[in-house]
Amino acid sequence: MAETATIARPYAEALFRVASEAGAGNLGAWSELVSEMGQVAANPDMQALATDPNISGDKLEEVFLSVLKSPVNDEARRFVKLLVENSRLTALPEIAEQFHALKNAREGSSDVEITSAFPLDASQTNELVAALERKFGRKLYAKVAVDPSLIGGVSVKVGDEVLDTSVRSRLAAMQAALTA
């Protein structure tokens, strides 16, 4: 994984520079396109195509671009061509992650992973995100998951920081205190 991250970094930085030069208004569109490209490249069938020595670079590029639903501009086409020529299409999911991290850093925002024991409705999610934004002092983009093993409460991850208020973690802490 570290090797893929190292390979992906210069590609992500270069693509981010190109997207930034296109204007701040286009950064959102670029982010969506790069995210979609990363998802398509992560598909096992696409991974198999990308590593198949019998598939020509032109054919791989054509197939990859035809699968994308978002409109693809000339810069993105050239970027895909560069990845195919350098046999780096399989690194595109990591490139997309690093691109997203660069975008968040530019905007002063972060992603937040919220895991709840029970499904949260939109108002609960918005209220929780608003409280977390006040705590962390920046805009947060929520990704919500449900994990019944938490028993109750939520676990929140923002970057490297984890806030675990789940019943499961409290029970584990009580067990550790009682057995110590």
Swiss-Prot record:
Query: What InterPro entries does the database record attribute to this sequence?
Result: ATP_synth_OSCP/delta_N_sf (IPR026015), ATPase_OSCP/dsu (IPR000711)
Q: Tell me which positions the record assigns to the signal sequence.
A: none
Q: A Pfam family name for this chain?
A: OSCP
Keywords in alphabetical order: ATP synthesis, Cell inner membrane, Cell membrane, CF(1), Hydrogen ion transport, Ion transport, Membrane, Transport
The record lists the membrane-crossing segments as none
A GO CC term assigned to this protein in UniProt: proton-transporting ATP synthase complex
MF-aspect GO terms: proton-transporting ATP synthase activity, rotational mechanism
| This protein's record includes keyword Transport | yes
Location of this chain's protein in the cell: Cell inner membrane
Q: What membrane topology is annotated for this entry?
A: Peripheral membrane protein
* Family according to the record: Belongs to the ATPase delta chain family.
Question: Cross-referenced NCBIfam families, in alphabetical order?
Answer: ATP_synt_delta, PRK05758.2-2
Q: What does this protein do?
A: F(1)F(0) ATP synthase produces ATP from ADP in the presence of a proton or sodium gradient. F-type ATPases consist of two structural domains, F(1) containing the extramembraneous catalytic core and F(0) containing the membrane proton channel, linked together by a central stalk and a peripheral stalk. During catalysis, ATP synthesis in the catalytic domain of F(1) is coupled via a rotary mechanism of the central stalk subunits to proton translocation. This protein is part of the stalk that links CF(0) to CF(1). It either transmits conformational changes from CF(0) to CF(1) or is implicated in proton conduction.
On subunit structure and binding partners, the annotation says: F-type ATPases have 2 components, F(1) - the catalytic core - and F(0) - the membrane proton channel. F(1) has five subunits: alpha(3), beta(3), gamma(1), delta(1), epsilon(1). F(0) has three main subunits: a(1), b(2) and c(10-14). The alpha and beta chains form an alternating ring which encloses part of the gamma chain. F(1) is attached to F(0) by a central stalk formed by the gamma and epsilon chains, while a peripheral stalk is formed by the delta and b chains.
Full protein name: ATP synthase subunit delta
